[in-house]
């Protein structure tokens, strides 16, 4: 048991340190995500030292269950490809320009507009995509208008990691935890809609309270126009994303798994675009750019952490944790512990470990534990930058754009907004369950 705990702890610490210090290394013209290799090294060490057997790993990876790591990776990457494609066509920037244009120079209006826009786009895509595409736009916009970007960038980060609770596909951590109890799209939504609404309202109210004094000054609106250069390709991508989401929602009626559908739509989109480009005698540049931005680093990251989580499970660590937590007040306990653990381990390792921990529960206690852990995995992302990989990338983007937003600044706002939002979300969950 102890070797497994030490391996897991060292791997999580090394992962966070690597992301903070040197997350990427440029080899030629390609940026390699160094941090993704850390869990793989930890997993190999666990195998070599006999903490888990190769047979156990192969059996786990070939599971027919919905929470198979391979299925989760396919689902996440294919959904990400659909979203990244839209970003490559300029869709997100176009929507952001429209949102800002309607505010007539009011900072409060811009604040509300960007929060709502980030929330809506998160619901139809995913939190990581919105954070990584919206943050540079907001930084550039605020620089041109000579206004403080912090209220806007932090609010869209909070919006993305709050409204990502609504659908199972909104965050990979939702998928890890929900699929561990074979939850489908509609079953997930039927539970999480109220906690998400409660959390969304609470987070917005807290953000307004924190930043209201910074939003009183009027600014001169920028009159430039942003036009989608190739509307047909944008509409095709949007149609595929919408149809994919709807198809995933009705899957229970056809006994199909989510990863089949998402992979089909991602492949079908690329084939369609390649054919459209070929007809126009153009290179499929947008497809190549989309593939170059795909989160393939999730493959070694997830597989490595899955092996480490399996080692903890096989050596009785997760069962011991479950016994230690107990079965009283599961929503409160797992909600708070998952939020804190996400900021000690990062939310992806945390969700994989908690999926195993909750596996020893049953009935109503299991449901409350799983869904409250999902809430913690999302809201924990804005308690500190360590809560999610997107948080660390978020601070890196701000640094590259010259925005002064230190670790302590993030925590100052996070410790005000996150606890209230967490309490609201858990209250909604307790009402539903």
Model regions: which residues?
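Helix-loop-helix module between adjacent transmembrane segments
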Residues: 79-87, 105-109, 117-127, 158-167, ...
């Amino acid at each position: 048991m102890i070797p497994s705990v030490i391996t897991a702890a060292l791997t999580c610490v090394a992962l966070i340190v690597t992301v903070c210090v040197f997350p990427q290394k440029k080899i030629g013209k390609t940026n390699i995500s160094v941090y993704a290799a850390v869990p793989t090294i930890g997993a190999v060490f666990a195998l070599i030292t006999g903490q888990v057997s190769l047979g156990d790993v192969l059996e786990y990876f070939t599971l027919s269950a919905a929470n198979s790591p391979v299925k989760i990776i396919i689902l996440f990457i294919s959904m990400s490809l659909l979203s990244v494609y839209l970003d490559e066509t300029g869709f997100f920037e176009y929507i952001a320009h429209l949102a800002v244009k309607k505010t007539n120079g009011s900072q409060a209006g811009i604040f509300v507009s960007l929060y709502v826009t980030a929330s809506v786009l998160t619901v139809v895509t995913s939190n990581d995509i919105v954070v990584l595409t919206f943050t540079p736009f907001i930084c550039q916009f605020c620089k041109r208008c000579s206004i403080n970007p912090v209220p806007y960038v932090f609010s869209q980060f909070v919006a993305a990691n709050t409204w990502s609770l609504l659908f199972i596909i909104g965050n990979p951590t939702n998928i890890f935890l929900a699929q561990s109890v074979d939850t489908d799209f509609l079953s997930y939504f039927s539970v999480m809609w109220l906690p998400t609404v409660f959390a969304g309202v609470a987070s917005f109210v807290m953000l307004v309270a924190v930043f209201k004094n910074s939003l009183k000054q009027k600014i001169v609106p920028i009159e430039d126009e942003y036009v989608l250069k190739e509307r047909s390709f944008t509409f095709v991508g949007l149609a595929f994303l919408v149809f994919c989401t709807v198809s995933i929602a009705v899957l229970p009626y056809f006994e199909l798994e989510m990863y089949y559908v998402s992979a089909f739509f991602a492949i079908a989109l690329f084939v369609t675009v390649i054919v459209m480009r070929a007809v126009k005698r153009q290179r499929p540049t947008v497809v190549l750019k989309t593939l170059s931005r795909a989160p393939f680093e999730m493959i070694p990251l997830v597989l490595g952490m899955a092996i480490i989580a399996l080692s903890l499970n096989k050596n009785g660590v997760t069962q011991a944790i479950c016994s230690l937590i107990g079965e009283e007040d599961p929503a409160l306990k797992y909600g708070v512990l998952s939020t804190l653990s996400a900021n000690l381990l990062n939310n992806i390792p945390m969700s994989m470990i908690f999926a195993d921990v909750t596996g020893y529960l049953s009935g109503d206690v299991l449901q409350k534990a799983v869904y409250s852990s999902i809430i913690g995995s999302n809201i924990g992302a804005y308690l500190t930058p360590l809560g999610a990989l997107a948080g660390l990338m978020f601070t890196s983007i701000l640094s590259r754009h010259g925005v002064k937003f230190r670790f302590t600044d993030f925590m100052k706002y996070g410790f005000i907004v996150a606890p209230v939002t967490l309490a609201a979300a858990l209250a909604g969950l307790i009402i539903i369950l």
